[in-house]
């Protein structure tokens, strides 16, 4: 009676260890993909911010508008990011683009933080334009 009980305990322990190793391996891969997605999102936001600075606060309305920005050729993250991720371009230059990850993993809060940063930039540029206009 003692031998089958010991085999069951060993089998359960081995299965638990195997599940832990498999889970660790899977989550490590997801974390690495999330870091890559975050880098791509950051590169796109940097190009959008640069465009806005160069164009008096106006936001780009297409991917073609930011493709000529400095650093574009040296950053494969931007081109790859625009291919894999979604940027909902605004209909007018006073609205911020909205980023979406298309189901790709991202870091905790990355999309919300970057979209808030773009909205804040658009809001500042609209406030700055209306403050400069004569009454």
Please report, for each region that a protein language model flagged, where it lies by residue.
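Periplasmic/extracellular, small/polar-rich flexible segments of pilin-like filament-forming proteins
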Residues: 58, 74-135
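Conserved hydrophobic/amphipathic alpha-helical signal-anchor segments
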Residues: 23-78, 84, 122, 126-130
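Short, Lys/Arg-rich N-terminal segment immediately upstream of the first membrane anchor
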Residues: 1-5
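Hydrophobic membrane-insertion alpha-helices, especially the h-region
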Residues: 8-24
